[in-house]
Amino acid sequence: MDSQDIRYRGGDDRDAATTAMAETERKSADDNKGKRDQKRAMAKRGLKSLTVAVAAPVLVTLFATYFLGTSDGYGNRAKSSSWIPPLWLLHTTCLASSGLMGLAAWLVWVDGGFHKKPNALYLYLAQFLLCLVWDPVTFRVGSGVAGLAVWLGQSAALFGCYKAFNEISPVAGNLVKPCLAWAAFVAAVNVKLAVA
């Protein structure tokens, strides 16, 4: 009879342990579902902010290019040299550069970099505004020298962005590198346009 009591008590403990484990697993599954829902909601917010961060600079650049557009003088000056790209390629690459800078700025923002280093935000805004001003000054007004001055300021702000972004997020810093290369090429185009 003692052995029956032991088995019975063991079975009762086993049932209680099984019930407790099942309850723990259920709570864990509920917690995981809640965490999964939280992560999904956070990912949706992140995707929305990424879309805005990339699309806004591209759309503003497109707007400035279209409405503040260019005059016919670029075509005449560009024909004087074979290495100067056509205007549509110049504008398309400026749009891509704006998108890359928007993505880099978003990566810095996600890491809280604009709070840690507010100068990074000021440099980003300065390079973006100077990029917007460059097209009308160089092409609409037709001043190659003033355009070169604006572009050199934009390039300096871009280099400052590279240094600041690279300290916060190396990936963001690497995204600025193609923009720096493009800025150097456009500076060379500006010199040619200023001389021509």
Curated annotation (Swiss-Prot):
Keywords: Chloroplast, Endoplasmic reticulum, Golgi apparatus, Membrane, Plastid, Stress response, Transmembrane, Transmembrane helix, Transport. Induction: By abscisic acid (ABA) and osmotic and salt stresses (at protein level). Induced by methyl viologen. Disruption phenotype: No visible phenotype under normal growth conditions. Residues 1-16, 23-35 have a biased composition (Basic and acidic residues). It comes from the Eukaryota. Pfam families: TspO_MBR. Changing residue 115 to A: No effect on the ability to bind heme. GO terms for biological process: porphyrin-containing compound metabolic process; response to abscisic acid; response to osmotic stress; response to salt stress. The chain crosses the membrane at residues 47-69, 88-108, 120-139, 142-165, 174-196. It is a multi-pass membrane protein. Specifically expressed in seeds (at protein level). GO terms for cellular component: chloroplast membrane; endoplasmic reticulum; endoplasmic reticulum membrane; Golgi apparatus; Golgi membrane; Golgi stack; membrane. One of its GO terms (molecular function) is heme binding. It is found in: Endoplasmic reticulum membrane; Golgi apparatus membrane; Plastid, Chloroplast membrane. Residues 1-40 are annotated as: Disordered. Plants overexpressing TSPO show increased sensitivity to ABA and salt stress. Cultured cells overexpressing TSPO have reduced greening and chlorophyll a content under light-growing conditions. Stress-induced membrane protein that can bind heme and may play a role in the transport of tetrapyrrole intermediates during salt stress and contribute to the detoxification of highly reactive porphyrins in the cytoplasm. Belongs to the TspO/BZRP family. This is Translocator protein homolog.
